[in-house]
Every structure is written in structure tokens, then in C-alpha cells.
Amino acid sequence: MSMNIAIDGPAGAGKSTIAKKLAKELGFIYVDTGAMYRAMAYYVLTNGIASSDEAKIAEACQDVDVTIAYENNEQQVILNGKNINGFIRTEEVGNMASATSVYPVVRTKLVELQRKLAESTDVIMDGRDIGTCVLPNAQVKIYLTAGSKTRAQRRYDELTAKGVSCDFDEIEKDIIDRDYRDMHRETSPLKQAEDAVLVDSSEMDIDEVVEAIRSIYEEKKSC
């Protein structure tokens, strides 16, 4: 039987960074579900479809094939046969992913692939509703969070390190707005699963968070 670890939490909490490092340490496959939603959002953006046009987005779902491949132990997101890893981490794509993920047709298509992966493989998945919806039977569930200012600072530092000009207050506002949308959407809103362990990373570095989650995993595994 495969072992599944679900890591949920708001944007900018460090889910992807933590999940990747933990997966490497444990020898699990890391599945960045957010990247799959970003792939769908990238398709919507590049085809000039408005985030409010549910009918056209539903049509787009029929034309979209999102798969995951691994190259040098790094996850690659493939959209209709093209590697789009280098195009899906912008703020524009992130905001579109949040806006389009509210549509059931988008979520249905991507959740099906995510569950298929988890059935046969030891995986770590991170997202907004992994423990509550995608993998409700995951043996380990984590709700990873941090204050909005902490998350905004991390994003600001990440962007400025890449030479991208940005405004801290605008980044924090985007984060707060996305939190609200994700927590209040009708389908699978962001919330902590009843059996998830809360980990607040506001005052923790990456290694400390990884160690905390690994300890939770080892404890669950021994039960």
C-alpha cells in the first residue's frame, strides 16, 4: 500500500519548498498540484480566455492534457506535450490559477490525475485541499501556514533576488485577497482537515519545518 503525505495551506506558506525537500529525504515522489492548476491557468491566459468565462474554460479543459514527468529528479509540468515549467511561476499565472480553480470542471480533471498518482506511489502532495478533498485518506496530513506579512516578505525577497521590481504592500494585499478567495470558494475551500497537524512556519526556517513534519511522519508510520 502506498504512503501519502498531504500538505495544505495558504499561498506563500512554503508548501512547495518544504514538500520537495521532504520528498527527497524520504524517497517519495513530489507532486506539486498547484503547478498543475498553474498549467491550466497558463493555457487560459495564452488563449485569451477571461477568468470569468466559465463556459470557455470548460471547453478548454477538453483540450488540455497536463502531465508530470521527472528529469534529473526534478518535476517537469507538461502541457499538451510542451514543458512549461519556466512559464508558470509568475504572479499573473498564480492569480489566474486561483480564479479558475473555483470551477468544478477544472478541479475534476486535475484531481483525477492526482489520485491516480497517489494510488500506486508514495507521494507528497501540496495544495489547498489535498487532505480534505484530493487525498482524504492520506496517512499524514499537515496544515502549513504563516502570517501574511511573513509570506509577503518571503515572496518579496524571492522576486527581488531575481531582479524583479515589486511592491511589498501590493504583494501582501494579493496574498490576503487570495486567502479570502481560496477560503470562501464554493468548491473545496481552503481549510484545515480535522485530522491535520497545524505547523506555523512564521518563526521557523526550512530545515526546522522539514524536521517537524518528518517527526510527525515517523510517529504516524510507527502507529
Language-model segments: what does each one mean?
Residues A11:
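The conserved Walker
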Residues A69, Q114-S120, R128, T132-C133, ...:
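Small-molecule kinase domains that catalyze NTP-dependent phosphoryl transfer to phosphate-bearing small molecules
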Residues N4:
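Walker A (P-loop) ATP-phosphate-binding motif of ABC ATPase nucleotide-binding domains
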Residues E25-R89:
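N-terminal phosphate/diphosphate-binding loop that engages ATP/GTP or pyrophosphate donors
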Residues K15:
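Conserved lysine of the Walker
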Residues I7:
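Hydrophobic anchor at the beta1->P-loop junction of P-loop NTPases
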Residues N85-A97, S101-K162:
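ATP-dependent NMP and nucleoside kinases share a basic, alpha-helical "lid"
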Residues I18:
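Hydrophobic positions on the alpha1 helix immediately C-terminal to the Walker A/P-loop
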